[in-house]
């Protein structure tokens, strides 16, 4: 017989979500956060740009993106070149003119829309040592790290920052549905077309990039001033953590209870529950705050389930401290944020049998077309030409 657990509601308020914005809590812990810059408020046009389809970046080098001529984007002026191929000069002139027209059509000028903001970002990056990690009020674009060299969200120029923001599902979700899990919105702030009408002053946070050891990052769940659980943040097995567990657990508990909770209670009394990510570098005598997030289900509960956290006894003398060990490493052996690296067509097909069949048919057609094109190609004097 299957045991069913009651779905536990999270009584989350708008104010609690807003108080987890970086600019609300970071200034309270000047000695426990890495150097950062906040650019705020962000103009509405920039928010629309981040949420818009397509990616247009203000390249610092050329301010343009040019698509090369190929079979997928043929330009009409290239037609009938064979009819005048004997006139080399005319062909070259036609090629030059058509290429110029083509480039003018495809040049994408994005920097002109937000020149001041781009300048602020560039200046902030320089002041922070030339390497930064971007984020908005709540989420950082970790799910888009696969677009960056080394799979690391380390930005050295404006283009890097914008690429990550526009490619991140986490960032887009924060912009479109920041209060989706709020239990009760104010009466005059009901949702319209699925989006919240509450005005949010969005901010761009640039944090100085540090090469952190992921094994020493931990997530702490706090409710009503009590720690419900502590979880390893990176879901890989590290042998050395087991012997450090008592020391790490004690240090994290003391820091969160004595410093984080007390400071937030004094400055942000309405923030009664939250999730704090901490970094505990060797020699373990100082702890840094990476982020403070709203206490909601879209935040990863890692080695806990949300039902465990919501039904935990806050007055218990024992705080669960969970690590990936040799026996449970397989349970979490998946690529993190892999769902953000798959085309929407594939995700939709996985949930719809008919869509899956249609996707398979389209893929088969594409494969057949490519095979036919390869069969029609011949090699003449070392050059591939069409038959």
UniProtKB/Swiss-Prot annotation:
- Name the InterPro entries on file: CDC123 (IPR009772)
Which is a GO BP term held by this UniProt record?
eukaryotic translation initiation factor 2 complex assembly
Main location group: cytoplasm
Q: Which residues form a coiled coil?
A: none
Q: Which UniProt keywords apply?
A: ATP-binding, Chaperone, Cytoplasm, Magnesium, Metal-binding, Nucleotide-binding
According to its UniProt record, where is this protein located?
Cytoplasm
GO MF terms, alphabetically ordered: ATP binding; magnesium ion binding; protein folding chaperone
Residue positions binding ATP: 135, 138, 140, 142, 207, 209, 217, 219, 233, 277, 291, 293
Q: Where does Mg(2+) bind?
A: 291, 293
Q: In its keyword annotation, does this UniProt entry include Transport?
A: no
What does this protein do, in the record's words?
ATP-dependent protein-folding chaperone for the eIF2 complex. Binds to the gamma subunit of the eIF2 complex which allows the subunit to assemble with the alpha and beta subunits.
The protein depicted here goes by the name Translation initiation factor eIF2 assembly protein
Which species does this protein come from?
Lodderomyces elongisporus (strain ATCC 11503 / CBS 2605 / JCM 1781 / NBRC 1676 / NRRL YB-4239)
